[in-house]
């Protein structure tokens, strides 16, 4: 599970903390792009690699079943953290859904040598996603444009992977 913070140590940034997200040691926001551990493991020979989200339980269940039959396997599951992210207690699933629907957390899997990017409709914007959490309260319009550019760059990279491995 990935909550993009070291919550037990006061919400320090991790390698997977999203760009511009405020952490306890970087109140102005993390400047580096996150590491994409699933892609690293895919290139390292894992038989099954996927991303998932608590907002899409049927997809998560399907991926867990697929991972159990292919070892080594890795699933990176987005799990929002209320203290680190700063959202209302009852909105964890909604925040997770916004991450997926805005493109900040793409869903994909690598199985049997095929990379498959899931086609999730973009019903939310990066601005919607950022507005759902206090860790992004400091962002300016320019910052939001940078986040949107990050999503575009990520979409482009993953699209090339899908075309290259599966086309």
Model-assigned labels for residue ranges:
Residues 7-8, 58-60, 82-86:
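Short acidic/glycine-rich loop or secondary-structure boundary segments that cap or lie
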Residues 1-67, 73, 81:
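Conserved thiamine diphosphate
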Residues 12-18, 57, 65-70, 86-98:
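Short, surface-exposed, charged loop/turn segments at secondary-structure junctions
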